[in-house]
From Swiss-Prot:
Name of protein: Pollen allergen Phl p 11
Family: Belongs to the Ole e I family.
Glycosylated residues in this chain: N24
Disulphide linkage map: C14-C85, C17-C127, C38-C73
UniProt superkingdom: Eukaryota
Keyword hit for Cytoplasm: no
This protein's GO CC annotations: extracellular space
Amino acid sequence: DKGPGFVVTGRVYCDPCRAGFETNVSHNVQGATVAVDCRPFNGGESKLKAEATTDGLGWYKIEIDQDHQEEICEVVLAKSPDTTCSEIEEFRDRARVPLTSNNGIKQQGIRYANPIAFFRKEPLKECGGILQAYDLRDAPETP
Protein backbone atom coordinates (compact mmCIF):
# COMPACT_ATOMS: atom_id res chain seq x y z
CA ASP A 1 0.00 0.00 0.00
CA LYS A 2 1.81 3.10 -1.23
CA GLY A 3 -0.17 5.83 0.54
CA PRO A 4 1.33 9.21 1.44
CA GLY A 5 4.99 9.65 2.26
CA PHE A 6 6.49 10.87 5.51
CA VAL A 7 9.55 12.73 6.65
CA VAL A 8 10.97 11.50 9.95
CA THR A 9 13.08 14.11 11.70
CA GLY A 10 14.84 14.23 15.03
CA ARG A 11 18.09 14.97 16.81
CA VAL A 12 21.03 12.96 18.11
CA TYR A 13 23.05 14.14 21.10
CA CYS A 14 25.93 12.99 23.29
CA ASP A 15 25.08 12.28 26.95
CA PRO A 16 28.48 12.80 28.63
CA CYS A 17 27.04 12.19 32.12
CA ARG A 18 25.20 8.95 31.19
CA ALA A 19 22.17 10.62 32.76
CA GLY A 20 19.56 9.41 30.28
CA PHE A 21 18.44 12.98 29.60
CA GLU A 22 20.01 16.18 28.31
CA THR A 23 22.12 18.28 30.68
CA ASN A 24 24.06 21.51 30.19
CA VAL A 25 27.13 19.51 29.06
CA SER A 26 25.23 17.46 26.45
CA HIS A 27 25.98 18.36 22.85
CA ASN A 28 24.52 17.49 19.46
CA VAL A 29 26.37 14.93 17.35
CA GLN A 30 27.21 15.88 13.77
CA GLY A 31 27.71 13.04 11.28
CA ALA A 32 25.95 10.35 13.33
CA THR A 33 24.17 7.59 11.41
CA VAL A 34 20.59 6.67 12.31
CA ALA A 35 18.19 4.21 10.71
CA VAL A 36 14.42 3.86 10.57
CA ASP A 37 13.42 0.26 11.16
CA CYS A 38 9.81 -0.97 10.71
CA ARG A 39 8.72 -4.44 11.81
CA PRO A 40 5.33 -6.16 11.96
CA PHE A 41 3.55 -5.89 15.35
CA ASN A 42 3.79 -9.66 15.78
CA GLY A 43 7.56 -9.69 15.18
CA GLY A 44 9.36 -10.99 12.15
CA GLU A 45 11.56 -9.50 9.49
CA SER A 46 12.16 -5.79 9.07
CA LYS A 47 9.85 -4.30 6.40
CA LEU A 48 11.82 -1.09 5.99
CA LYS A 49 15.33 0.06 6.74
CA ALA A 50 16.35 3.58 5.75
CA GLU A 51 19.43 5.48 6.92
CA ALA A 52 20.43 9.11 7.31
CA THR A 53 23.31 11.15 8.70
CA THR A 54 22.92 14.07 11.10
CA ASP A 55 23.77 17.61 10.02
CA GLY A 56 25.96 20.16 11.82
CA LEU A 57 23.28 20.69 14.47
CA GLY A 58 22.70 16.98 15.09
CA TRP A 59 19.40 16.81 13.15
CA TYR A 60 18.50 14.14 10.60
CA LYS A 61 15.72 13.78 8.03
CA ILE A 62 14.65 10.47 6.54
CA GLU A 63 12.08 10.31 3.75
CA ILE A 64 9.74 7.34 3.90
CA ASP A 65 7.61 6.78 0.81
CA GLN A 66 4.68 4.80 2.18
CA ASP A 67 2.30 4.12 5.05
CA HIS A 68 3.40 1.56 7.67
CA GLN A 69 0.15 1.21 9.61
CA GLU A 70 0.67 -2.49 10.35
CA GLU A 71 4.19 -2.04 11.69
CA ILE A 72 6.12 -0.63 14.62
CA CYS A 73 8.65 1.89 13.32
CA GLU A 74 11.59 3.21 15.30
CA VAL A 75 14.54 5.49 14.69
CA VAL A 76 17.62 3.63 15.93
CA LEU A 77 21.18 4.83 16.51
CA ALA A 78 23.66 3.15 14.18
CA LYS A 79 27.07 4.86 14.41
CA SER A 80 28.74 7.84 16.07
CA PRO A 81 31.68 9.66 14.47
CA ASP A 82 32.76 10.82 17.95
CA THR A 83 34.93 8.08 19.47
CA THR A 84 34.66 9.66 22.93
CA CYS A 85 30.86 9.44 22.77
CA SER A 86 29.86 6.33 20.86
CA GLU A 87 28.38 3.91 23.42
CA ILE A 88 24.93 2.61 22.50
CA GLU A 89 22.70 1.51 25.38
CA GLU A 90 19.97 -1.00 24.65
CA PHE A 91 16.42 0.44 24.93
CA ARG A 92 17.81 4.00 25.17
CA ASP A 93 19.07 4.00 21.59
CA ARG A 94 15.72 4.36 19.83
CA ALA A 95 12.58 6.47 19.45
CA ARG A 96 9.27 5.13 18.15
CA VAL A 97 7.58 7.03 15.31
CA PRO A 98 4.07 6.45 13.91
CA LEU A 99 4.31 6.16 10.11
CA THR A 100 0.63 6.04 9.27
CA SER A 101 -2.04 8.57 8.36
CA ASN A 102 -4.70 6.69 10.33
CA ASN A 103 -3.72 7.81 13.82
CA GLY A 104 -5.19 11.28 14.18
CA ILE A 105 -1.85 13.10 13.92
CA LYS A 106 -2.47 16.24 11.89
CA GLN A 107 1.13 17.22 10.93
CA GLN A 108 1.08 16.64 7.21
CA GLY A 109 3.68 14.00 6.59
CA ILE A 110 6.21 15.15 9.20
CA ARG A 111 6.98 12.90 12.16
CA TYR A 112 9.15 14.23 14.98
CA ALA A 113 11.08 11.56 16.87
CA ASN A 114 12.27 12.13 20.44
CA PRO A 115 15.98 12.96 20.73
CA ILE A 116 18.23 9.90 21.10
CA ALA A 117 21.71 9.79 22.61
CA PHE A 118 25.09 8.18 22.45
CA PHE A 119 26.86 7.86 25.80
CA ARG A 120 30.43 8.38 26.96
CA LYS A 121 32.11 5.25 28.30
CA GLU A 122 33.05 7.14 31.48
CA PRO A 123 31.06 10.18 32.68
CA LEU A 124 32.85 13.54 32.77
CA LYS A 125 34.39 14.54 36.15
CA GLU A 126 31.93 17.39 36.62
CA CYS A 127 28.85 15.18 36.13
CA GLY A 128 28.37 14.44 39.84
CA GLY A 129 27.84 18.11 40.61
CA ILE A 130 25.73 18.64 37.50
CA LEU A 131 23.37 15.79 38.37
CA GLN A 132 23.16 16.96 42.01
CA ALA A 133 21.93 20.31 40.70
CA TYR A 134 19.00 18.47 39.09
CA ASP A 135 18.06 17.17 42.57
CA LEU A 136 17.04 13.72 41.39
CA ARG A 137 15.70 12.45 44.69
CA ASP A 138 12.45 10.52 44.59
CA ALA A 139 9.35 12.68 44.60
CA PRO A 140 7.39 12.50 47.86
CA GLU A 141 4.69 9.88 47.90
CA THR A 142 1.20 11.23 47.47
CA PRO A 143 -1.28 10.06 50.11
